[in-house]
């Protein structure tokens, strides 16, 4: 097989044939399951992929900004601009809901899931993710820990997602210590002769 194509596809054997998706947007969906983060993530110990998304651009920026900040500080990166693509997709599966409660139920849920929603320690959330995935769960939704008004989803199975497509391109400016600003990139403009 062509090594370049193999690198683009990732480790396809991580996804069972019946869970694989194809067609428009499939590469974007499958990438989360075939290109693993060896360090793990909120709901994965690094041995399997999870497709993470946020309900809004503001929440996505907060979540991505946090994780990129951790990486850029750890690698002591100088000022730079990071280009990101906003992807929209439909979640077409029933998810375990850690975010949907209101009133008293919301308070009880917050107490019950406090360890799972810890902003820095992922031990409890990785245990929960492993248990839910092993039980065949499609994924879960939870209140963002980086944006108090936001919600996130973590999808364990590619077939839960449909119609993934690029919606916008944004750039986040890293000033060497933090993200100072972001902007949406517009369409191309012809350069005058």
Residue ranges of predicted features:
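Active-site and NAD+-binding cores of ADP-ribose-processing enzymes
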Residues: 1-14, 18-44, 69-193
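Extended catalytic/binding region for NAD+/ADP-ribose chemistry, centered on the ART fold
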Residues: 42-68, 139-142
